[in-house]
Amino acid sequence: VSLPSQTTEFHTNVVTGTGLQALANSVAKYGKRDCFSTLQKFVAGSYDGKICILYGLRRTGKTTLLFQMLSELPIEKTAYIKVQTTDDMSRLTKDLKVLFELGYRYVFIDEITLLSDFIDTAAVLSDVFSMMGMKIVVSGTDSLGFAMANRDELYDRSVTIHTSFIPFREYARLLNIRSVDSYIEYGGTLKMENMSFDDPDAAFDEVAFRDDESTRKYIDTAISRNIQHTLKNDHYGEYFNQLRELYEKGELTNVINRI
């Protein structure tokens, strides 16, 4: 296995080598979403100048799909990046340049919409790094952010995979649960009592839809905050329009919840 030297310094949270293998092992027990074949097609196909966008609500298997896909690729050529709110596109592109020079050709970037400047700078991923021969797969819960990026920066430069809708047939196959009541109770997501199919970080969260409070928490984190995050960052907030006053008063979340 070829690993970065000890002197290699990254500006974001980059995982390679044995760490990458550990991530792959963590999801080995899970079945694959039906959309996994679309992700496979992108990674194996010729899509120069395009990136793959994996988006959808929390707990619909996005991170698991990334880990399952990278487990099928040469570990010495594959890297995983977990974006944090303190990162920006400049830091990310510096790391992508380093990874390219080290021979990495498959890069999976999780929660990329946390970058405050993603919407206005996303084209660098498709126009530069994809054209250089890197296969880049990004994921995130902020569907509105991806939609706005596709409107401008990534117009005709992406292959999109939407994970939010999980048919009952697929739900039953993945969780081996054939109860329509359970499917409805948990909103068609893959998170249930003592079971976390998606992001390992969510393993300690309250179970979504168990009661009114957990349902409200899910809506706040998976929907309301994402909408506000996108409106704030897109073109420096110019699309807030009439929503700005509600946002500044801290009332926008309640309005979205009522809707």
Where are these regions (language model features)?
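A short, basic N-terminal segment
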Residues: 1-49
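Hydrophobic anchor at the beta1->P-loop junction of P-loop NTPases
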Residues: 54
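Conserved lysine of the Walker
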Residues: 62-63
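Short glycine-rich substrate-engagement loop in P-loop NTPases that contacts/grips substrate
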Residues: 76-103
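Conserved P-loop NTPase "ATPase switch" module shared by AAA+ and STAND
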Residues: 100-122
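Sensor-1/coupling segment of RecA-like P-loop NTPase cores
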Residues: 128-150
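Interdomain motor-coupling "hinge/lid" segment immediately C-terminal to the ATP-binding subdomain
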Residues: 146-259
